[in-house]
């Protein structure tokens, strides 16, 4: 046997043993025997790099190379499902499907696993790409990290799979792994993960795949897409996918009647507590792919599927005290400190009280027995008080009047429930919160910096605001606690690299109230530089797509503050991209000036976001709904029948991709 043949043999053996252990849960060899085979393969691959294969089992161990994720457009948009919490709405969904199809249909009921969504692409039986849901149009390429998940096959079994296809599913962190990870974080005095979903999502986005490999993520796959799929049945296709090596949930049922659907829901509403992974509902899908196509999509979700969410679990425990947290915007949040209680698979010690009105409405007293719920929320919340056991009335909980961090008198804006600390330039949590937001991945994305490092730099007087980051040198931070030469160099390198971050993300990084990622993009496309934005009036801001008076006034208030203007000037001096690059400004025309355009369907040549950019680049305006003022509809495949009917009724022109591209060329 040649070396190459031996390597191939070991790879096949290890792929099979991975499948036996992680998917079938039926190992045929011991862990030691598996490790010995893996070590033998690693040695041979190291000695013979000419036989390197990206899909080798050895690629699952992860790498400590730190790199940014690239964004990849989804071939098929990853839409979210419509949610329902009532059986009446499930009945309405069933009736809508029956009326629209006017023929027999089956509903496939599946567990709704509570993790992070993933889309896997396979070509010729090999995993070539793994992409997160992102915004539904495009997501992060996390292929290297996903390759560390043992239940996801790198190479498929058999040979009857399509040449190219996508399969989607949920990346999960089992309860046992989640609890062990939080015990480790607690021992290191690090912030705990709130739930397995956050832990799985956070792990998948780590830029060190060796750590990802150590976190023992799992995956269930639940939807197959592509041409030449085995059958017209969604359920049947998943059974075929299981034969190819995918981990498909056995907790599925094809239902012929609505009563069978409810039987499935009611059974798992009780039994889900015994599962080793988090679930939060049941997904209902029309089983026939042909019928799915006939039903089509709305702008946000498929008409052939719905998610029934389980009611939040609740528990009774004692309220010991109320503490207060100050966020980066100055919002003060009351937090209930409780006797530990088991809820939804985790031990709950704290719960949000949200604001003064909630506290007053609950008539809370220290020592009360309170009901705690945990639904989709990250932090549990108190929903009621058991006054029947209030024998000894403790001190009534009253919302504080002054900031717990800096002592400033709190204010409450008209029409808002929250109280705020107005001392935004000298209140420590606000300053640190603004810096943490500034360095975050979706903002300036500064590698090596995190909350602990920011806290240390702030305590030592090295930074007082975001602009101070750009004055730091390696000598300033070398030798600090857990800060060696390499760590110091990486942080300074990350800070310098952030100067290349585009205008829209710098706007988002400023932390202007109500200005999220989407609004920041709209602003960046509407002004050539920060000076134009600083000097914009209310009318100019309101005329920007998706910006109302509330956001516009927040922007005006931000730049009316002299401290903020000085900060922006210092960031500009530091070299940040507070302007649109020349290439962005070139190519603009007025070919679509004055036209309001609706985008609908799935596209081939560009993504929906790219078409929105093209519309704005040529002077047009993107609008979300059809009205008599709509100029035309840019339509791709699977345009919703409701939009089609409304466009026809109003006599609005429908334009395909080719016609649109010709129009703007």
Swiss-Prot record:
GO terms for molecular function: DNA binding; DNA ligase (NAD+) activity; metal ion binding. Pfam families: BRCT (PF00533), DNA_ligase_aden (PF01653), DNA_ligase_OB (PF03120), DNA_ligase_ZBD (PF03119), HHH_2 (PF12826), HHH_5 (PF14520), Nlig-Ia (PF22745). PROSITE patterns: BRCT (PS50172), DNA_LIGASE_N2 (PS01056). Coiled coil: none annotated. One of its GO terms (biological process) is DNA replication. The active site is at residue 112. Belongs to the NAD-dependent DNA ligase family. LigA subfamily. The gene is ligA. GO terms for cellular component: cytosol. HAMAP family: DNA_ligase_A. NAD(+) binds at residues 31-35, 80-81, 110, 133, 170, 285, 309. The keyword Aminoacyl-tRNA synthetase does not apply. Its EC number is 6.5.1.2. Its cofactor is Mg(2+); Mn(2+). Zn(2+) binds at residues 403, 406, 421, 427. It comes from Bacteroides fragilis (strain YCH46). This is DNA ligase. It catalyses: NAD(+) + (deoxyribonucleotide)n-3'-hydroxyl + 5'-phospho-(deoxyribonucleotide)m = (deoxyribonucleotide)n+m + AMP + beta-nicotinamide D-nucleotide. Residues 587-665 form the BRCT domain. DNA ligase that catalyzes the formation of phosphodiester linkages between 5'-phosphoryl and 3'-hydroxyl groups in double-stranded DNA using NAD as a coenzyme and as the energy source for the reaction. It is essential for DNA replication and repair of damaged DNA. Keywords: DNA damage, DNA repair, DNA replication, Ligase, Magnesium, Manganese, Metal-binding, NAD, Zinc. InterPro entries: BRCT_dom, BRCT_dom_sf, DisA/LigA_HHH, DNA_ligase, DNA_ligase_CS, DNAligase_adenylation, DNAligase_N, Hlx-hairpin-Hlx_DNA-bd_motif.
């Amino acid at each position: 046997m040649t070396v190459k043949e031996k390597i191939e043999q070991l790879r096949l053996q290890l792929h099979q043993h991975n499948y036996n252990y992680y998917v079938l849960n039926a190992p045929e060899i011991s862990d030691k025997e598996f490790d010995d085979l893996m070590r033998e393969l690693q040695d041979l691959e190291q000695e013979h790099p000419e036989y390197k294969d990206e899909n080798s089992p050895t690629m699952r161990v992860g790498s400590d190379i730190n790199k940014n994720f690239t964004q990849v457009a989804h071939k098929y948009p990853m839409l979210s499902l419509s949610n329902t919490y009532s059986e009446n709405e499930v009945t309405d969904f069933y009736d809508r499907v029956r009326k629209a199809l006017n023929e027999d249909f089956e509903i496939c009921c599946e567990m709704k696993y509570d993790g992070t969504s993933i889309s896997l692409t396979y070509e010729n039986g090999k995993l070539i790409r793994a992409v997160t849901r992102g915004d539904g149009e495009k997501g992060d390429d996390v292929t290297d990290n996903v390759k560390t998940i043992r239940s996801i096959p790198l190479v498929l079994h058999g040979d009857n799979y399509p040449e190219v296809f996508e399969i989607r599913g949920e990346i999960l962190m089992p309860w046992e792994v989640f609890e062990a990870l939080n015990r480790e974080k607690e021992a290191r005095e690090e912030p705990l993960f709130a739930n397995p979903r956050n832990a799985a999502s956070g792990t998948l986005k780590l830029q060190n795949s060796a750590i990802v490999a150590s976190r023992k993520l799992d995956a269930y796959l639940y939807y197959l897409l592509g041409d030449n799929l085995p059958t017209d049945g969604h359920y049947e296709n998943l059974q075929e996918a299981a034969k190819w090596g995918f981990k498909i949930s056995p907790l599925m049922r094809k239902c012929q009647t609505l009563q069978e659907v409810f039987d499935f829901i009611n059974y798992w509403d009780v039994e889900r507590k015994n599962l080793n992974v988090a679930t939060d509902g049941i997904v209902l899908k029309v089983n026939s792919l042909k019928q799915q196509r006939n039903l089509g999509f709305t702008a946000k979700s498929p008409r052939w599927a719905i998610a029934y969410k389980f009611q939040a679990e609740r528990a009774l425990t004692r309220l010991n005290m109320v503490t207060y947290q100050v966020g980066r915007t100055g919002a003060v949040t009351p937090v209930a400190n409780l006797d530990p209680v088991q809820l939804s698979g985790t031990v709950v010690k704290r719960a949000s009280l949200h604001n003064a009105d909630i506290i007053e409405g609950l008539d809370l007293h220290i020592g009360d027995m309170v009901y705690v719920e945990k639904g989709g929320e990250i932090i549990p919340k108190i929903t009621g008080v058991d006054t029947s056991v209030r024998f000894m009335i403790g001190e009534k909980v009253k919302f504080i009047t002054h900031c717990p961090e800096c002592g400033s008198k709190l204010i409450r804006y008209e029409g808002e429930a929250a109280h705020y600390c107005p001392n935004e330039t000298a209140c420590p949590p606000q300053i640190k919160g603004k810096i943490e937001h500034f360095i975050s991945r979706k903002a300036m994305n500064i590698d090596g910096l995190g909350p602990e490092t920011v806290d240390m730099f702030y305590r030592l007087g090295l930074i007082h605001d975001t602009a101070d980051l750009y004055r730091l040198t390696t000598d300033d931070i070398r030798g600090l606690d857990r800060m060696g030469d390499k760590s110091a160099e990486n942080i300074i390198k990350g800070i310098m690299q952030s100067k290349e971050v585009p205008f829209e993300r710098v706007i988002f990084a400023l932390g202007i109230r109500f200005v999220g990622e989407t609004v920041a993009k709209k602003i960046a496309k509407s002004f050539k530089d920060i000076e134009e934005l600083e000097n914009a009036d209310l009318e100019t801001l309101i005329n920007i797509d998706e910006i109302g008076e509330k956001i516009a006034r927040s922007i005006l208030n931000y730049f009316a503050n002299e401290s903020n203007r000085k900060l922006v000037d210092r960031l500009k001096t530091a070299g940040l991209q507070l302007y649109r690059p020349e290439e962005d400004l070139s190519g603009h025309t007025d070919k679509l000036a004055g036209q309001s355009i609706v985008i609908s369907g799935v596209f081939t040549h560009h993504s929906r976001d790219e078409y929105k950019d093209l519309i704005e680049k040529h002077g047009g305006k993107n609008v979300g709904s059809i009205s008599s003022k709509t100029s035309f509809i840019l339509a791709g495949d699977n345009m919703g029948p409701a939009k089609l009917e409304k466009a026809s009724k109003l006599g609005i022109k429908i334009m395909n991709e080719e016609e649109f591209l010709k129009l703007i060329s």
